[in-house]
Amino acid sequence: MMADTSLEAYDPDSMATLRHRVYETIKDCPVLSNRDLARILGREPSTISGRTNELCDLGLIRAWDTKKDPTTGKKVKIWEAVA
């Protein structure tokens, strides 16, 4: 069997690694918005929203509720792990 030589195998900030970190964080703390996740993981909210959309498409998380963000005043999704 050959070793994985892809960039993601060596890059701790790869999209696959970040997607996994987002999923694990949502499993541990289910009442989180993308902004909350970004703050916890030290990332930009735009990088988190892409990963949550991917996880939602995969059926691993779902929007549990919405709340009003105190900073922006916008309605935001609150995520929960499905599996």
What are these regions (language model features)?
Residues 24, 39, 50:
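DNA-binding alpha-helical recognition surfaces that contact promoter or target DNA
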Residues 1-25:
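Short alpha-helical segments that sit at the start of domains
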Residues 12, 62-83:
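Short, cationic-aromatic polyanion-contact patches
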Residues 43-57, 68:
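Short amphipathic alpha-helical interaction segments
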Residues 17-18, 33, 47, 52, ...:
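Ser/Thr-centric signal marking residues that sit
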Residues 1-2, 28, 80-83:
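Short intrinsically disordered terminal tails
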